[in-house]
Amino acid sequence: DAGKLIQVRTHTRFVHFPKHTHNYIEVIYMCSGSTRHVIDGNDVALMQGELLFLNQTAVQEIYPAGEDDIAVNFIILPEFFDYSLKMIGEENNLLRDFVVDCLRGENDSSGYMHFKVADVLPVQNLLENLIWSIWNRQPNKRSINQATMGLLFLQLMNHMDRMEMGTGGKQR
């Protein structure tokens, strides 16, 4: 899988993951059930249909997930977001700032963004499309995945009132 800008993996259940960081951006989508995380000292409960973005500097601890707790982890290299960033334009907002900070390797924003969007059908559909597209090899896969992520960002920008972020980084 070396060289891939985005990968998808199922979340490992029944195991405690002590505090750690990643050299990539992690996006966790909770398909069913829930998982409990401590991110940069903040307790985060990720519920079914919710989305959690973690930057490269986020310190994450994960408590064991149960049998019915199913999550998908997107492992994303920062350059994957180049196209998506063009789609969301130049307007300043917390999501754009988060992505730009990830691209620059800076930690000016919080280490995570938690979107409580379980009842937002377009977001759920785009996440399902992204998982399907990554899992199933097809022509134009990279462009499709990057455009889908851009559409996901645009939808999330319409629901910033459902986003929570950690206390780290600068506040706007």
Label for each model-derived stretch:
Residues V15-H22, I62-A65, L85, K141:
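Short histidine-centered beta-strand/loop micro-motifs
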Residues G41-Q56, P64-G66, I70:
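Short acidic-glycine-tyrosine-enriched beta hairpin
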Residues Y112-V117, I134-A147, L154-R172:
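Short, Lys/Arg-enriched, Trp-marked, Pro/Gly-tolerant hinge/linker segments that flank
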Residues H11-F14, Q48-G49, T57, E79:
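Tight coil/turn sites that cap or link beta-strands
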Residues D1-L5, A65-W132:
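A hydrophobic/aromatic-rich effector-binding and dimerization subdomain
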Residues S34-R36, L52, Q56-E61, F80-D82:
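Histidine-centered metal-chelating micro-motifs
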Residues D1-T35, V44, G111:
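Generic protein-terminus/edge-of-domain signal
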